[in-house]
Amino acid sequence: DRLADQAILDLARADVEFIDVGKKPGFPTPQEMINTLLVHLGSQGLNVVRLKGGDPYVFGRGGEEAQALIDAEVPFDVVPGISSAVGVPAAAGIPVTHRNVSVGFTVVTGHREKGGATSINWEALAQVGGTIVVLMGVSERAEIATRLMSGGLASDTPVAAIRYGTRPEQTTIRTTLGELADAPLESPSTIVIGQVAAFDFSPTAGTSAWARKAGHASLD
């Protein structure tokens, strides 16, 4: 996965073979190819790790890969992860829920389906309330903002976009829904929309304990 930090890959044994099947904007690795590769290698009795960022079953196509392995009768295991939908905002000091502010959150993908259509009813989502976390939505942020405002969300609704969340190079851009289209966002970024996006409960020392243990100097 393209979101796997190199520091994690460096922990592998020297004789491990790395196969890059990351999905980059404009240069995606076809999911069918990934499924076939997993089945092919797994059928040989090899120890295959499909390393992903976040949780494999939250917009990670993990279910499709699991189904392919089941159909081919290749045994597998799943190690749950912390979804970037909650882990990345937390690393930026943003709680996706907060008493008297947001009693729930919705996680959606901003990625379009084949053919250019989107299956998300953004206008209806604007009426749900709570926090909206958008994954893979950088390139579609203009339409997302327009449709959410058409659905009733105020243009001054706080928005935070966190790039490379939990990593040393993490950056956070704070803006509003009305200005989201012109914000200098880059992929990969997790977009948080709602009143909680105005919060900044970052560690008071500037670096969280787990980051210090990992040898990271700062998350700023």
Annotate each PLM feature.
Residues 89, 94-111:
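Short, glycine-/small-residue-rich phosphate/pyrophosphate-handling segment
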Residues 8, 69, 88-89, 144, ...:
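Hydrophobic packing residues within well-ordered alpha-helices of enzyme cores
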Residues 22, 80-82, 100, 111, ...:
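Residues at the C-termini of beta-strands that transition into short coil/loop
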Residues 1-82, 179-186, 219:
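Class I S-adenosyl-L-methionine
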Residues 83-87, 192:
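Short alpha-helices
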Residues 3, 33, 44-49, 61, ...:
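A contiguous loop/helix-start segment that scaffolds small-molecule binding in enzyme catalytic cores
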Residues 25-30, 108-114:
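Short, flexible loop segments at the rims of nucleotide/cofactor-binding pockets, characterized by
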